[in-house]
Amino acid sequence: MDDGGHRENGRHKAAVQGQWLMQHQPSMKQVMSIIAERDAAIQERNLAISEKKAAVAERDMAFLQRDTAIAERNNAIMERDSALTALQYRENSMVTAPAANMSACPPGCQISRGVKHLHHPHMHHHHQQHHIPQLTENAYETREMEPNDGLPTSPPAGSTLESAKPKRGKRVNPKATTQTAANKRGPKNQRKVKKESEDDLNKIMFVKTTHDYTDEDSSKHILIGSKSDWKSQEMVGLNQVVYDETTMPPPVCSCTGVLRQCYKWGNGGWQSSCCTTTLSMYPLPALPNKRHARVGGRKMSGSAFNKLLSRLAAEGHHDLSNPVDLKDHWAKHGTNRYITIK
């Protein structure tokens, strides 16, 4: 070991250990450059975040525009469908009205103005003239044929004697047997002949009388009819519209000033959610003596609702894609005591 405390083999060197333990101190320039790089990275990150937010906002705007375009397309499709249904209803009413008039019009009548199909009375007149001789011929044939069927045919003398001979050997007069058989079968057949001939004469007279009607008499004959006939003729011209909950919105009531959707009631009927015959408020008051129940609103049956839809569609005043306001169409009679709150 020398004076400095160092060993010759180099194991113990205090000065060398002091050099390794010293840390490298960066300069001020290096610190400033590192801070500047960090600030630049932060700015780039903030720019990227702002660009991302702008892209998300543009995407949301595109989504909104797409949704509005889809809604407009759906509205256009619904308007087109409603217009097509209205046109179809009118075409069907124009087609069915002349057919109803043709079926209900006797000879010589005049169809109201505005109907495309006209009735030709001379063709019906020719058809009746052609039909009358057939009836008269059939009547004469029945008169000629029926009495022969009613009177018994006289069989040969030998056959009557053989069939009329009793087993004990008694002789029976063949004239008496034929007369008794005729007496047994004759009156009923004669009645039948008279009845059929009278029916044929009635048919002929009915055709003649209907043929001899003038225009005024025929118009009077049309006006004289039962109320059910008039009602059936009116209903033939109307198109029966059936409510379809998949394509048509439920009806509403605007008695409170706000459109309130109605409740389903019965078989296709509807019940008001905001009015009774004496009260108009929403919601209707609850019953104190009945749990989960309110005062019953005004009602409309399913058949009445379908008739209302048919009338509105025939008049063309209402678009079936919009809900029907039942404010002025409710039934005049009373309602049930309560409705269940759902």
UniProtKB/Swiss-Prot annotation:
UniProtKB keywords: Coiled coil, DNA-binding, Nucleus, Transcription, Transcription regulation
GO biological process, one term: response to ethylene
Pfam families: GAGA_bind
Region (Alanine-zipper): 41-76
Record bears the keyword Transcription regulation: yes
Residue interval(s) of motif Nuclear localization signal: 192-195
Primary site of residence: nucleus
Gene that this polypeptide is encoded by: BPC6
Annotated GO MF terms: DNA binding; protein homodimerization activity; transcription cis-regulatory region binding
Segments for region (Required for nucleus and nucleolus localization): 164-195
Subcellular location(s) of the protein: Nucleus; Nucleus, Nucleolus
Keyword Transcription regulation: yes
Lineage: Eukaryota, Viridiplantae, Streptophyta, Embryophyta, Tracheophyta
Lineage top rank: taxon: Eukaryota
Domain notes: Alanine-zipper domain is involved in homo- or hetero-dimerization via electrostatic interaction.
Composition bias type Basic residues, residue spans: 185-194
Ranges for region Disordered: 143-199
Tissue: Expressed in seedlings, leaves and pistils. Detected in the base of flowers and tips of carpels, in sepal vasculature, in young rosette, in the lateral and tip of primary roots, and in ovule at the exception of the outer integument.
Chain segments annotated as coiled-coil in the UniProt record: 41-67
GO cellular component: nucleolus; nucleus
Protein name per UniProt: Protein BASIC PENTACYSTEINE6
Organism per entry: Arabidopsis thaliana (Mouse-ear cress)
Oligomer and partners: Homodimer. Heterodimer with BPC4.
InterPro entries: GAGA-bd_tscrpt_act
Entry function: Transcriptional regulator that specifically binds to GA-rich elements (GAGA-repeats) present in regulatory sequences of genes involved in developmental processes.
Family: Belongs to the BBR/BPC family.
